[in-house]
């Protein structure tokens, strides 16, 4: 039973009254039933207190299921490879992958043997957290079944979960930066037939084309911004952090906000991904941190030289080796509702599974391609985040990343109360240096996709005794920077984290220097430079970096667009005058009240991306913040392309049914709760720090699917952390919940909230409610 503040001294447990005990008394011994206290504050955020890990996990699983039962149940179906069984093979996942391809990947990835090995590698604390989570989730499921499951998941695919399900979810997270990007290429890999030439149906071609786009946009769609400000630059002389991860607003990568406490051992608040009984991004009494998706490589492809006598054998150092053949069977729902087992052979080399991408990674009589994912051997990820959660100093925090090396595919930025700002690119990266890359890869391919020679053992990953895992870089050879002014990151390489101390000379698989920066990084460095010149940086300054919604690229090219409008319209003046008027009236932002000029600007710049000569000032590695810039409208080729882009933009806006009076808030919305809520922000590629990814909706609207998610600005004073934050898509994914849209409304209005952290702050919250649960009480 949940009770509010006036009654917080007592709860009902069955028919008896029970005093709410201090957390130390919630569990008397490890072998007794788990108990947890769940205190909810504004927006339904749970503050969970328990005496040990099992009790804490119990509270996390219970609270999460209260808010997101359907979401997690659906993800459990996915990672078990059962989507074709329940929904049919031709339907698509939330990520627009075919159910069949997804099922094949997860049946292969999450074998009983792999799960057993992963579980065996977990420390007792992690096992207890997961066991408690399972018990808490299943208790909430039982309670909700009694009342009636939420409509979206009132179906037979919702079931109690096990610790194996949590392991499956974790392993899915690990391969997001590797083999998970090759789902279609993995599922479609078949040896060439001797009887007929390689044939690929149109549906597979389309799926692979979509996969190629996803692969290229991985860092964008799983992107982030983060700024860590040190004592030299912060307004109060202490550490200050902005966390602005850009993650999906639904599915298995949707953040959940919570506060976890084991008195005397753990006190951490922030956000976590589904199924994880710990905090991924957050703060504790001593420090605050965030992550940004890195540009490092977390897998390599290996070109196999095939045995001329058998295309399922490959040559390694001149010796013929048979590919491994693993049969995977997927249950598939038939049109009549019956189930049929569909078997598939997954081929692999010593490096990993064979993948086939027609026209890119062909499996023919001469060659095939095998993928080695470094994170497949990373069983340290949960231990890593839990160690970070417990860190009582920045040194302890940094040491844990050096020792455990469990971060899969993100950078880490952190500050402490003393005002030290730290950047670490310490993720799991294959140990392949520039010399080996030059010797073992085809230079024509470049470094976007690393393809090594799979016919020579010397081209395999190097082994370092310092590394936590065979074949990856030791942390001592990866980028890191400790500053007293600032470090920042927005999904570029590590080299311009702080222009005063460029990070150079690393393996191309880790970080490449001298490369153009993305528009968000240029915006951040420009803004921080201006603030640095003006004096100090405040928490309000960091909030404004996100919330003022400046379109940074507009400052570089809008004057040229308006100049073109004034003198180059020619015979198209009648058609283009409304567009030019809208551009002139536009405020250069992605705010709710920004005019239709922003829509025109987006369409124009999207069209111009393919024009190589569009920049008047090309990229200069000596001036990466301010180059490239300016549209070269004096170039006839650029002028012609610009005219075509403008005309196309006019047609597209008209087709969408938008009027000259349309505002950005009328167009970009979130309808997750069932009603459209206006959402500010815009495309990351235009330099909008408050990045949003959208898909086409009804009536010309754009529906947000990814972008700014969990926001926090953390500062410190004598009492500890002071934090403000928001969860842009709200705490619950259940449209019927009171907390399915409340924070989304607040985000729309740019209303940050104080995040209650201390006991006094939590209990003083106007929405304070408390619930005590125990395994004994659920029997």
Swiss-Prot record:
InterPro entries, A to Z: Ntn_hydrolases_N, Penicillin_amidase_A-knob, Penicillin_amidase_dom1, Penicillin_amidase_N_B-knob, S45
Record's signal peptide: 1-25
Protein name: Acyl-homoserine lactone acylase PvdQ
Catalysed reaction equations from the record: an N-acyl-L-homoserine lactone + H2O = L-homoserine lactone + a carboxylate
Lineage per the UniProt record: Bacteria, Pseudomonadati, Pseudomonadota, Gammaproteobacteria, Pseudomonadales
Broad class of where this protein is predominantly found: periplasm
Molecular-function annotations in GO: hydrolase activity, acting on carbon-nitrogen (but not peptide) bonds, in linear amides
Family according to the record: Belongs to the peptidase S45 family.
Other remarks on this protein: AHL-mediated signaling mediates quorum sensing in many species of Proteobacteria, regulating hundreds of genes, including many that code for extracellular virulence factors.
Assembly and binders: Heterodimer of an alpha subunit and a beta subunit processed from the same precursor.
Function of the protein: Catalyzes the deacylation of acyl-homoserine lactone (AHL or acyl-HSL), releasing homoserine lactone (HSL) and the corresponding fatty acid. Possesses a specificity for the degradation of long-chain acyl-HSLs (side chains of 11 to 14 carbons in length).
Pfam families with a match to the protein in the record: Penicil_amidase (PF01804)
Catalytic residues, chain numbering: 224
EC number(s) from the headed UniProt entry: 3.5.1.97
Gene3D superfamilies named in the record: 1.10.1400.10, 2.30.120.10, Glutamine Phosphoribosylpyrophosphate, subunit 1, domain 1, Penicillin Amidohydrolase, domain 1
Keyword Signal: yes
